[in-house]
UniProtKB/Swiss-Prot annotation:
Keywords for this protein: Cell cycle, Cell division, Cell shape, Cell wall biogenesis/degradation, Cytoplasm, Glycosidase, Hydrolase, Peptidoglycan synthesis
Signal among keywords: no
Family: Belongs to the glycosyl hydrolase 3 family. NagZ subfamily.
GO annotation, biological process: carbohydrate metabolic process; cell division; cell wall organization; peptidoglycan biosynthetic process; peptidoglycan turnover; regulation of cell shape
NCBIfam families: PRK05337.1
Main location: cytoplasm
Any one GO MF annotation of this record: beta-N-acetylhexosaminidase activity
Domain of life: Bacteria
Active-site residue list: H177 (proton donor/acceptor), D249 (nucleophile)
EC number(s) on file: 3.2.1.52
Species the sequence originates in: Shewanella sp. (strain MR-4)
Protein's name according to its UniProt entry: Beta-hexosaminidase
Compartmental location: Cytoplasm
Length: 342
């Protein structure tokens, strides 16, 4: 079961939210900045959640740069797009730094019993302002090299990686949080450029999860990728051989309105091939699904529990205080290098 990931309104779990968390179709919880006031409060919140649903997958968007939900008491992770410039184009050095930043990002979350960061971004840095420096680079080969190192650092902390936003969000100007982006390029451009980081990292077995884009690529398929069985079943599963978890992006985003109300959006996402659907910032929307949606009788073929951390690896990583401290200093060094350029 457990097809739904939801969120919380505040710094602790209300009784109504506790009831939602107990629902058998709820398998995941995503945290936001509004759920955080301090590291101590966050740890207490996670403990409260675990008392209600010990096995639930707890996730956050904690990529670095401007997308980092927890700040006070956490290291500020540089934007991924700052790594290679800070290394002055030295790819060997940049890869080593990316690995250490992946480790740092993951271990600071795992130390608070948070399972997963939806990272890294595998989009190319093109015209999309909502992506921008969240991307490692405009060049596929640089994205592949740096993302692989970042993912390997995450794995050394015990955390799996979720690549986003398949097959690529970097070449559309519209922000799918507030609009319906349409990528008018020919299929050849997408398959020869944007999809390459996903293709290569899947082939190398580096991705445990993938999040598709709420973007329409009309020269390929009329549906947004997250609602497209062609993109998810034919391309991602069959042609690229991906066997991890497919998470929908937030079904509350404007880019998801294509599929109608929440019942329609959930059905379209699951029919297309998503294993877990996200509904954020909309409690009534969550309740409409829990009370009115006809969920699949069978459990997800690729359950989100596959993204639970490697506990033995995390235990080893938590003992490595010197690596953690050195990675913090590296993050600060890259931040200072970027500030000096501005």
């Amino acid at each position: 079961m457990s097809y739904l990931m939801l969120d919380l309104l505040s710094l602790d779990v209300s009784e109504a939210e506790a009831e939602m968390l107990r629902h058998p179709q709820v398998g995941g919880l995503i945290l936001f900045s509004r759920n955080f006031s301090s590291r101590e409060q966050l740890i207490a919140l996670v403990q409260q959640i675990r008392q209600i649903r010990p096995e639930i997958l707890i996730a956050v968007d904690h990529e670095g740069g401007r997308v980092q939900r927890f700040r006070e008491g956490f290291t500020l992770i540089p934007a991924m797009g700052d790594i290679l410039p800070a290394a002055k184009g030295d790819m060997v050095l940049a890869k080593r730094w990316a690995c250490e930043l992946g480790f740092l990002m993951a271990i600071e979350l795992l130390a608070c019993d948070i399972d997963l960061s939806f990272a890294p971004v595998l989009d190319l840095n093109g015209i999309s302002q909502v992506i921008g420096k969240r991307s490692f680079s405009a060049k596929p080969d640089e994205v592949i090299a740096l993302a692989q190192s970042f993912i390997e650092g995450m794995a050394e902390a015990g955390m799996g990686a979720v690549g986003k936003h398949f097959p690529g969000h970097g070449s559309v100007a519209a922000d799918s949080h507030i609009a319906q982006p349409i990528d008018e390029r020919e299929a050849e451009a997408i398959f020869n450029q944007d999809i390459l980081p996903f293709k290569e990292l899947i082939a190398k077995g580096k991705l445990s999860g993938i999040m598709p884009a709420h973007v329409i690529y009309p020269k390929v398929d009329p549906n947004p990728a997250g609602f497209s069985s062609y993109w998810l079943k034919q391309i991602l599963r069959k042609e690229l051989g991906f066997n991890g978890v497919i998470f929908s992006d937030d079904l509350g985003m404007k880019g998801a309105a294509f599929a109608g109300d929440y019942l329609g959006r959930a059905q379209a996402a699951l029919d297309a091939g998503c294993d877990m659907i996200l509904v954020c910032n909309d409690n009534p929307g969550v309740m409409s699904l829990l009370n009115g949606f006809v969920w699949p009788a069978a459990a997800p073929q690729h359950p989100a529990s596959l993204l639970k951390p490697n506990a033995a690896q995390t235990a080893i990583a938590l003992e490595n205080a010197s690596r953690w401290e050195n990675a913090k200093q590296l993050a600060e060094q890259i931040q200072l290098a970027q500030q000096a350029k501005v």
